[in-house]
């Protein structure tokens, strides 16, 4: 595995690889890798001749009161996970390398961002789309892999890749969970022991809602209220949102049918956790 820290070298490597006909699987991350990321890397390894992993904590996608400065970082750990999962190139640029001057252009996302995390985190998805536009231009991937834990992010990325005719295939990968159901996340390290137990109720609330839908409930308000009430009863966390939308358009639905997403965000003392399920309802 080769570690690359400059844009120029990474672009030279990937342009030569593509010119020689090699397929490139790209996994963009902010580091502090866990089994969810490893799953993305393994899928990229299965489907491509070359695997590129980026580790970059992108300041553009953090708001003024968010956890940019304390976001967990451990490049030695990330290198080990990368090697264990067959990464060929680890792209590890500094902030100064990625943003050497003040940005004169950003990618403004006008759809799919006014709900869920986009509503709570203004500017977040513009930051995500901007850094991905840069990373796609740097790594020139054949396929790019994203976890469905950030399902809104996946919907936004699919939209902007289509809108800008970016020649990359977006590959969504199912949420990876701990044995007890908690969605794997780099931010889980912020949970206290008691909060870690309470956090299990996030996925349980979604499973209960899924059972109600499968039993025939089609009123979205009843489903979302069920989720909110369950979380508020079983945790000390604050429900940021518990919403149901059509997916991937993220538009309101009057009836639970077609492909839908039921998504939640819950604030604990030192961390905000998200989770979701997507269903196709007939």
From Swiss-Prot:
Q: Which reaction does it catalyse?
A: (R)-pantoate + beta-alanine + ATP = (R)-pantothenate + AMP + diphosphate + H(+)
Gene3D superfamilies hit by this protein: HUPs (3.40.50.620), Pantoate-beta-alanine ligase, C-terminal domain (3.30.1300.10)
Enzyme nomenclature, EC number:
6.3.2.1
Q: What class of enzyme is it?
A: ligase
Task: Name the keywords, alphabetized.
Answer: ATP-binding, Cytoplasm, Ligase, Nucleotide-binding, Pantothenate biosynthesis
Q: Which GO terms describe its molecular function?
A: ATP binding; pantoate-beta-alanine ligase activity
What does the record's miscellaneous section state? The reaction proceeds by a bi uni uni bi ping pong mechanism.
* Similarity section: Belongs to the pantothenate synthetase family.
**What PANTHER family does this protein's entry cite?**
CYTIDYLATE KINASE/PANTOATE-BETA-ALANINE LIGASE (PTHR21299), PANTOATE--BETA-ALANINE LIGASE (PTHR21299:SF1)
Q: How does it assemble?
A: Homodimer.
Tell me the protein's name.
Pantothenate synthetase
Species of origin: Bacillus cereus (strain B4264)
- Gene name linked to the record: panC
């Amino acid at each position: 595995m080769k570690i690359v820290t400059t844009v120029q070298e990474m672009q030279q490597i990937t342009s030569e690889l593509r010119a020689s006909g090699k397929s490139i699987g790209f996994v963009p991350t902010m580091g502090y890798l866990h089994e969810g990321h490893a799953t993305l890397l393994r899928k990229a390894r299965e489907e491509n001749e070359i695997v590129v992993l980026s580790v970059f904590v992108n300041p553009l996608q953090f708001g003024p009161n968010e956890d940019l400065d304390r976001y967990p970082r451990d490049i030695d750990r990330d290198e080990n996970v990368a090697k264990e999962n067959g990464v060929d190139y680890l792209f590890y640029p500094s902030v100064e390398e990625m943003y050497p001057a003040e940005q004169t252009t950003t990618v403004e996302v006008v759809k799919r961002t006014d709900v869920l995390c986009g509503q709570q985190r203004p500017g977040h998805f513009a930051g995500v789309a901007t850094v991905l536009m840069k990373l796609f231009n740097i790594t020139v991937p054949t396929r790019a892999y994203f976890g469905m834990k950030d399902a809104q992010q996946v919907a936004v990325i699919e939209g902007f890749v289509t809108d800008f005719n970016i020649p990359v295939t977006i590959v969504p990968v199912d949420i990876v969970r701990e044995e007890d159901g908690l969605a794997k996340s780099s931010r889980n390290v912020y949970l206290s022991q008691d909060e870690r137990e309470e956090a299990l109720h996030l996925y349980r609330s979604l499973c209960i809602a899924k059972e109600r839908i499968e039993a025939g409930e089609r009123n979205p308000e009843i489903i979302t209220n069920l989720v909110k009430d369950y979380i508020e009863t079983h945790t000390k966390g604050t429900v940021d949102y518990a919403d149901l939308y059509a997916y991937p358009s993220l538009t309101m639905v009057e009836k639970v049918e077609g492909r839908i997403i039921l998504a939640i965000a819950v604030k604990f003392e030192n961390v905000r956790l998200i989770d979701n399920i997507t269903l196709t309802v007939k």
